[in-house]
């Protein structure tokens, strides 16, 4: 290891607490199977003054998904043996069920149950356990797309996997993780920490910021195969060393987890067996992040370099950015690429995606544009006045007989869609929107629209209760969004699009959706 390599890495690691301030954190870097960095700082619990160390138990959240799939592959050479078990757990589905591999690759077509729970009126910090999960999953009647044809992030895919493994083996998922993963790998402290209210060693996750102050985050979810792993930095180091030690074995677990995955049409898929597959700084990378209120983590592995990075924060800073900065330092490449100064002026405006009914807002941003479509905004580089793109999306303006449109290509989702430009001129009578709308797909869940002092508010209700009333934001004629910045899970749905539909001039229905749960029709009561 050269002096310049050591200096770059030391500088990047030393900068983490200031760049990502919060109660505490930990980082590990491994190269060629050797631990180069193993460091914790700050406090796992600031009230009790418990230090954050490499042995501190941490809530790994969605990093769990690769371990769930690892357990699946350890127990079943051919996971499709369990396809009938998936079908049995979707009793009301009116179309062919996804198979087990569709679940593992996030190609199931299901709507994410944390998002759907908000449509059912789930309180943001309310209890959500096995019973609540089962009620939401059992209510599934339709899919967002035919299994295998596209990608969408769906947490219950992995809950279904762990539940099915429990039923098939007659053993708890905690025991299965222990025998299939923890013991062989040497993850000595790792556990299934299903209850999110507390960790057994007192580690706490915190909401807030330096400006507002940090406070313990309140969570009341019970997790299993989707996000239930509790592990220390030392446990994750053991995982990364196991990956390196078994790298040349043809049937090694990580080799099986990272085998190339495709969609049903043969196009390469960016996600498989609980792992994202991408390129960073010109290298192939497998990785995943984890998040819950108060907890952020990220791990990545560059097989060609035999290089791994693990980052944990017990606060809400962007662990994925931190891990990317550490990776850039380890590779000796700049973290921030040069960006274009071209402004895609022809794209700016508000659109409605025809296929899903989701809103898309394209706004000016330094070097290009900001696209508001997913849970969080995407920064696009301006290529020309009519084109902007990022690694996962391309948007191009076009004129058709029906007017100005844009084409949005999302190769990672294996789909291309048309964005129809919306009429942003004011003028409709907002009082006509008020009323109650009901969704047959969601067991008669409702959205209530009211005018409070002349201001439009909306709220969801369903089998989990009555949700908060939120002030709606008008985007265009009959197109509004209901903000959802906080939810049961950390990665909230974001903005729910409410696209009102009229017949004979009267509002009769509203099409509701977000990227995690799309295209749900609510009829006016």
Swiss-Prot record:
Binding site for substrate: 489
Stored SUPFAM superfamilies: beta-lactamase/transpeptidase-like, D-aminopeptidase, middle and C-terminal domains
One example of a Gene Ontology biological process annotation: proteolysis
Recorded GO MF terms: aminopeptidase activity
Keywords, ordered alphabetically: Aminopeptidase, Hydrolase, Protease
One Pfam assignment: Beta-lactamase
Catalytic activity: Release of an N-terminal D-amino acid from a peptide, Xaa-|-Yaa-, in which Xaa is preferably D-Ala, D-Ser or D-Thr. D-amino acid amides and methyl esters also are hydrolyzed, as is glycine amide
Superkingdom, natural source: Bacteria
Regulation affecting activity: Inhibited by beta-lactam compounds such as 6-aminopenicillic acid, 7-aminocephalosporanic acid, benzylpenicillin and ampicillin. Inhibited by p-chloromercuribenzoate.
Entry annotation: catalytic residues: 62 (nucleophile), 65 (proton donor/acceptor)
Keyword Cell membrane attributed: no
Gene3D superfamilies, per database record: 2.40.128.50, DD-peptidase/beta-lactamase superfamily
Protein EC: 3.4.11.19
Stated family: Belongs to the peptidase S12 family.
Subunit relationships: Homodimer.
PANTHER family: BETA-LACTAMASE-RELATED DOMAIN-CONTAINING PROTEIN, D-ALANYL-D-ALANINE-CARBOXYPEPTIDASE/ENDOPEPTIDASE AMPH
HAMAP family in UniProt: D_aminopeptidase (MF_01960)
Protein name as annotated: D-aminopeptidase
Natural source organism: Gluconobacter oxydans (strain 621H)
Upper classification of the organism: Bacteria, Pseudomonadati, Pseudomonadota, Alphaproteobacteria, Acetobacterales
Name of the coding gene: dap
């Amino acid at each position: 290891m050269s002096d310049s390599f050591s200096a770059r890495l030391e500088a990047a690691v030393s900068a983490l607490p200031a760049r990502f301030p919060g109660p505490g954190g930990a980082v590990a870097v491994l190269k060629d199977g050797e631990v180069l960095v193993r460091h914790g700082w700050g406090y796992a619990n600031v009230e009790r003054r418990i230090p954050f160390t490499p042995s501190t138990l941490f809530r790994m959240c969605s990093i769990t998904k690769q371990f769930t799939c690892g357990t699946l592959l350890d127990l079943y050479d051919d996971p499709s043996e369990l396809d009938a078990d998936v079908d049995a757990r979707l009793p009301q589905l009116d179309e062919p069920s996804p198979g087990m591999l569709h679940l593992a690759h996030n190609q199931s077509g299901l709507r994410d149950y944390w998002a759907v729970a908000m449509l059912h009126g789930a309180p943001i910090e309310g209890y959500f356990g096995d019973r609540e999960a089962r009620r939401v999953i059992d209510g599934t009647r339709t899919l967002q797309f035919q299994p295998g044809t596209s990608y969408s992030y769906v947490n219950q895919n992995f809950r279904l996997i762990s539940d099915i493994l429990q039923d098939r083996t007659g053993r708890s998922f905690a025991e299965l993780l222990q025998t299939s993963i923890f013991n062989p790998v040497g993850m000595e402290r790792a556990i299934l920490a299903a209850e999110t209210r507390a960790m057994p060693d007192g580690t706490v996750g915190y909401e807030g910021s330096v400006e507002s102050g940090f406070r313990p985050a309140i969570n009341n979810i019970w997790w299993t195969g989707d996000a239930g792993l509790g592990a220390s930095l030392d446990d994750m180091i053991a995982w990364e060393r196991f990956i390196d030690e078994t790298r040349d074995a043809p049937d090694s677990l990580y080799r099986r987890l990272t085998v190339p995955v495709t969609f049903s049409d043969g196009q390469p898929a960016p996600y498989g067996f609980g792992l994202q597959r991408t390129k960073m700084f010109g290298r192939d990378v497998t990785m995943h992040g984890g998040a819950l209120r108060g907890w952020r983590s990220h791990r990545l592995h560059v097989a060609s370099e035999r290089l791994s990075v693990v980052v944990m924060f017990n606060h809400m800073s962007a662990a994925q950015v931190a891990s990317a900065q550490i990776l850039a330092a380890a590779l000796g490449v700049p973290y921030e690429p040069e960006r274009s100064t071209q402004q895609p002026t022809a794209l700016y405006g508000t659109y409605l995606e025809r296929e899903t009914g989701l809103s898309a807002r394209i706004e000016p941003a330094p070097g290009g544009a900001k696209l508001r479509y997913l849970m969080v905004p995407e920064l696009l580089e301006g290529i020309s006045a009519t084109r902007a793109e990022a690694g996962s999306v391309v948007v191009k303006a076009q004129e058709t007989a029906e007017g100005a449109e844009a084409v949005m290509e999302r190769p990672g989702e294996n789909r291309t869609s048309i964005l129809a430009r919306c009429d942003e001129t004011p003028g409709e009578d907002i009082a006509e929107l008020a009323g109650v709308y009901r969704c047959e797909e969601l067991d008669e869940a409702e959205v209530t629209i009211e005018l409070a002092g002349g201001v439009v508010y909306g709220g969801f209700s369903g089998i989990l209760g009555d949700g908060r009333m939120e002030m709606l934001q008008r985007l265009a004629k009959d197109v509004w969004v209901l903000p959802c910045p906080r939810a049961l899970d950390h990665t909230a749905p974001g903005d729910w699009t409410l696209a009102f539909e009229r017949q004979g001039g009267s509002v009769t229905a509203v099409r509701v959706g977000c990227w995690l749960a799309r295209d749900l029709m609510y009829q006016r009561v």
